[in-house]
Curated annotation (Swiss-Prot):
The keyword Membrane appears for this protein: yes
Pathway: One-carbon metabolism; methylamine degradation
Membrane topology reported for the UniProt record: Multi-pass membrane protein
Protein name: Methylamine utilization protein MauE
Transmembrane segments: 4-24, 53-73, 75-95, 127-147, 153-173
GO cellular component: plasma membrane
Any single Pfam family the record assigns to this protein: MauE
Keywords: Cell membrane, Membrane, Transmembrane, Transmembrane helix
Location(s) in or outside the cell: Cell membrane
Function comment: May be specifically involved in the processing, transport, and/or maturation of the MADH beta-subunit.
GO BP annotation list: methylamine metabolic process
Length: 186
């Protein structure tokens, strides 16, 4: 394993980043439960009743994963759960890309902007899966973080999340602009 993956500051940065990612996803889904149910149903990988259950339960599971990632005794199982969820999300995205259903919304964040499914989103989820697995495998070998390392990791993880959300918003704006041009026949 790469030595940097067992550095306390790196692990804290990854844990905070993924925790913030999962809490942001959970909160946006909880605020827009019916809309998220429509997104899950529109993926057409589950029966209608299962889509309803997933739309109700998934945000709670995502919030629990977020909490687990920052509570050290729970961080390894939470990271494994995060990796499993991200892999399932990647599979659902890939199924729809393979079906040619790239016009549907990924449902990642309910920020008012639609983000169409694509191979890029599949890749993004696979990279996030790798980060979660890096936490799960690196944490047991890591030494405890000092206060400075923990604080630096916290700031680095929060900064990474802000950059990630900004890129996500820009991607949504770009997709909206492309859809608008297509609708106008340009």
């Amino acid at each position: 394993m790469a030595d940097f993956l067992i550095q306390p500051m790196v692990l804290w940065a990854l844990r905070i980043f993924l925790a913030l990612l999962f809490v942001a996803a959970a909160l946006s889904k909880l605020r827009h439960v019916e809309e998220f149910y429509g997104v899950v149903r529109n993926f057409r990988v589950l029966p209608d009743l299962a889509s309803r259950v997933v739309a109700l339960v998934l945000p709670v599971v995502e919030a629990a994963v977020a909490v687990g990632l920052v509570v050290t005794p729970l961080a390894v199982p939470a990271a494994v759960a995060a990796a499993a969820l991200l892999l399932v999300f990647a599979a659902a995205l890939a199924i729809n890309v393979l079906r040619g259903r790239t016009q549907i919304d990924c449902g990642c964040f309910r920020n008012g902007l639609k983000q169409p499914v694509s191979w890029l989103l599949v890749l993004r989820n696979l990279v996030l899966t790798a980060l979660a697995l890096a936490i799960a495998t690196g944490l047991p070998a890591a030494v405890p973080a000092s206060l400075t390392e923990g604080a630096t990791g916290l700031l680095a993880g929060a900064t990474a999340m802000l950059i990630y959300l900004s890129a996500s918003l820009l991607g949504g704006l770009s997709a909206a602009q492309t859809a608008n041009k297509t609708a106008k026949g340009r």
